[in-house]
Amino acid sequence: MRRFSFPLLAYAFAAIMVGTTLPTPMYALYADRMHFAVLTTTVIYATYAGGVLFALLAFGRWSDAVGRRPMLLAGVAAALASALVFLLADSVPLLLIGRVLSGLSAGLFTGTATAAVIEAAPQAWKTRAAAVATVANIGGLGAGPLLAGLLVQYAPQPLLLPFLIHIGLAVLAGIAVFVVPETSARIGRIGLQRLSVPNEVRTVFVIAALAAFAGFAVTGLFTAVAPSFLSNVIGISNHAVAGAIACSIFAASALTQVAANRMAAERAVAVGCGLLIVGMMILTAALCFSSLPTLIAAAVVSGIGQGMSFSRGLAAVVDRAPAQRRAEVSSTYFVVAYVAISLPVIGEGLAAQSLGLRTAGITFAITVAVLAAICLAAILFAEARAKLSAFT
């Protein structure tokens, strides 16, 4: 079975991540059935990040001590529990519980599955194992809304069938995890994941983390609010299209993270910030002119910018951090990212109540563009100062 460990673990990774974005095209149906507005939608979406952060901080070090398999199986169990709660959901509190459980599954799975996929890679795939893990992770996130959108639009039982299918995918993922050999040497210690930013990496961390914040805020916006943009601003009530828009930002991010892997970190973050600015300009145009093609273009361009700035920003931070503190620094970076995927989108929901969805979306886009511009200016200033120092 060892020879099949690599593809089986990659499948399990993707299958579990599918469930974390599966509800995206369904939020409009839940809103109609339970009579809630965009603000409640954003809160339901954002509770996912709370589950991720709890799992990351409480259990982030456990797989090094107890092994990859137990933690992956715990992630599968959380994913199954989330799907079951969504099957029974008839109130907002149950939707919140389902999202928290979904976040727990992602938090338990993401770091552990990434390590397991890399460790299980055969020699011929060692140099591409990290890219495979990235594609499995982000590809699963993108497949979730696409699958659900198609099922909600064209299949019966739109609030049940997507979760029944995901239960099947998750059960197969659990079997895959159970049958493959353990990949960890179990040399770590159980404990809470520490967070820190050493002084020698602080400047780079602040710039990279701000870029990651901007990119993940956009990802949260498209995942939580894009269906509302589509129906309420553009006037198209097609759940498959809503799912495809959410999918496109993840697909663009995944492909970019793989393609930009060898690009110089600082330059990649700068280019990523520039693309985020362009993406937000396109989003503003899409909302002003109620244009579907422009909204899709905004998702793709923003996904490229997010993927480039996030992945290469993480590389810049980790490369400069002391070896013994890299886990702490990278965990702090991920905390910033998951805060970004939740709090700003709740702000969008609050703004939509008083300003309207279109104006709130434009305000969000301008704010993210300003943040990305600050990061870009900081990078260019640091490069100019370094060149001046070298010259003198």
Residue ranges and their predicted role:
Residues Q306, L314-A365:
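A late C-terminal transmembrane helix in Major Facilitator Superfamily
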Residues A268-S311:
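C-terminal transmembrane helical hairpin of 12-TM major facilitator-type secondary transporters
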Residues G98-A136:
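Cytoplasmic helix-loop-helix junction between adjacent transmembrane helices
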Residues A242-A265, G279:
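Transmembrane alpha-helices of Major Facilitator/SLC transporters
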Residues H35, G67, L88-P93, P156, ...:
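Helix-breaking motifs and short loop linkers at transmembrane-helix boundaries and internal kinks
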Residues P93-S102, P293-V301:
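Paired small-residue
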Residues A124, R128-F178:
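Helix-loop-helix hairpin linking two adjacent transmembrane segments in secondary transporters
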Residues L53-P93:
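Conserved MFS/SLC helix-loop-helix module at the cytosolic interface between two early adjacent transmembrane helices
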